A protein has these predicted regions:
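Structural signature of tandem alpha-helical TPR/SEL1-like repeats
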Residues: 10-20, 48-59, 86-94
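Hydrophobic face of amphipathic alpha-helices that form TPR/SEL1-like repeat modules
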Residues: 4-5, 36-45, 74-81, 112-117
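Extended, hydrophobic/aromatic-rich amphipathic alpha-helical segments that build helical scaffolds
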Residues: 35, 58, 73, 93-97
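Short helix-capping/linker turns of helical repeat alpha-solenoids
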Residues: 13-14, 27-32, 44-47, 65-69, ...
């Protein structure tokens, strides 16, 4: 299934029905399926899937490792704003910056908004950018952000 098919399924069916279709695709590494499985596990809309934030983050990281920029943005939001996830502004900034690098939109990315909103130090910003650039250099599958 491609991205459009999965988005249509996500909004047309219950989360449980969608989960049952997407889970085998996610197991085979479909970056769109892993993103939406993660999304459903973190924020189930219709309560047909039980929330599991840690498992959801795992699926989002798989999607991000495959280069899906919305997964980086979702992870950035989780680490910056979600009360169920330990606040880590450097990680949030790095995820947002990676999304901007992937989309070639470094000048307008969410990383700039959280720099202003949270007053992140220049040292932390530089650390984040260095980590993101290192991830791009070694390949996302080898990125330090994804090592447990």
């Amino acid at each position: 299934m491609n991205e459009e098919d999965i988005i249509s399924l996500f909004y047309a069916k219950s989360h449980l029905e969608t989960y049952e279709v997407l889970f085998p695709l996610a197991q085979r590494g479909n970056k769109f399926a892993t993103y939406f499985i993660g999304n459903m596990l973190i924020s189930p809309i219709d309560q047909t899937v039980e929330a599991d934030v840690l498992e959801g983050i795992g699926y989002l990281k798989l999607s991000a490792k495959a280069g899906y920029s919305p997964a980086f943005e979702f992870l950035g939001n989780l680490y910056a704003y979600n009360e169920k996830v330990k606040n880590d502004l450097v990680a949030a900034h790095t995820f947002f910056y990676l999304a901007a690098l992937i989309d070639n939109k470094v000048d307008i990315g969410y990383h700039l908004m959280i720099e202003d909103e949270f007053g992140i130090s220049e040292a932390s910003i530089n650390k984040s950018k260095e980590l993101a650039e290192a991830c791009m250099a070694v390949g996302l599958e080898n990125c330090e952000l994804f090592k447990e």
